[in-house]
């Protein structure tokens, strides 16, 4: 694809005014194609996943970091322009025509104690795609080359898009649980991230139990190999060695902790969670049960997950929408009408 002229325009969606989806917070606009900085790539977007974090940004669950931001941080596209300093800035060379991925994390300082010890996801100066900077609900976007991702082969653009956040954050969440080999893992909520994480855990020999509100999601869980699937607040049939809470519902923390066996760990995968009810120490935490949060991801997480995905083909269920229906896609996600991980095609 030829790089667009500096005066070229594109179609995109912006968060006009954060609020519930039925108030029309998204607005479709025609705006200038962004220009890449010397350390950036200009990318023609081919597919962009529709993530629950996009919903949190759009509905105002998260504070506004950029007025009228273009959401979207699970971006797959084609490099059409390479900044003059990219060779020095990137961990690997990028050329025009390369397929590239753009994820949530797009900037860290590189010098703080967190960056130096390999925990760049905790960097106080971190910046995020589709929140601090414009994302992929558009025909074109930019990304710092140092935070662009080479992608595994064997996947379509649509299949790859959810791997860039739903996949990576699920992979990190699974690591945070310290699930023992052959252990029993509970998944609370079964949307885009959980249905990918389940396959990762199954490939590692885990036994999966799913608690989720949607009948279609429960059906998908069983099709993918879960040992059981029940309603969101139901108790699994066996004690769990670990659990991951994907649903942004604080009320589920207590039943998840109660389902843990001694020494079990509950990882909370989301960036936003409603209030957690009062805990009872003896009932919910004693016997060395733990709660752990999960904050973003590192580039090392992404590389490890993509290596895993290249070896174990993940079956990504991707209801597809055209770019012009981004508002409908987010509305369907909000209403629980999506099984799997929705993707916008551009």
UniProtKB/Swiss-Prot annotation:
PROSITE patterns: ADH_ZINC. InterPro entries: ADH-like_N, ADH_Zn_CS, ADH_Zn_typ-2, GroES-like_sf, NAD(P)-bd_dom_sf. The modification N-acetylvaline is found at residue 2. Zn(2+) 1 binds at residues 51, 73, 165. It catalyses: a primary alcohol + NAD(+) = an aldehyde + NADH + H(+); a secondary alcohol + NAD(+) = a ketone + NADH + H(+). CDD domains: CAD2. Binds 2 Zn(2+) ions per subunit. The keyword tRNA-binding does not apply. Gene3D superfamilies: Medium-chain alcohol dehydrogenases, catalytic domain, NAD(P)-binding Rossmann-like Domain. Its cofactor is Zn(2+). Keywords: Acetylation, Metal-binding, NAD, Oxidoreductase, Zinc. The keyword NAD applies. Zn(2+) 2 binds at residues 109, 112, 115, 123. GO terms for molecular function: alcohol dehydrogenase (NAD+) activity; oxidoreductase activity, acting on the CH-OH group of donors, NAD or NADP as acceptor; zinc ion binding. It holds the Pfam family ADH_N. Its EC number is 1.1.1.1. Belongs to the zinc-containing alcohol dehydrogenase family. Was identified as a high-confidence drug target. This is Probable alcohol dehydrogenase AdhA.
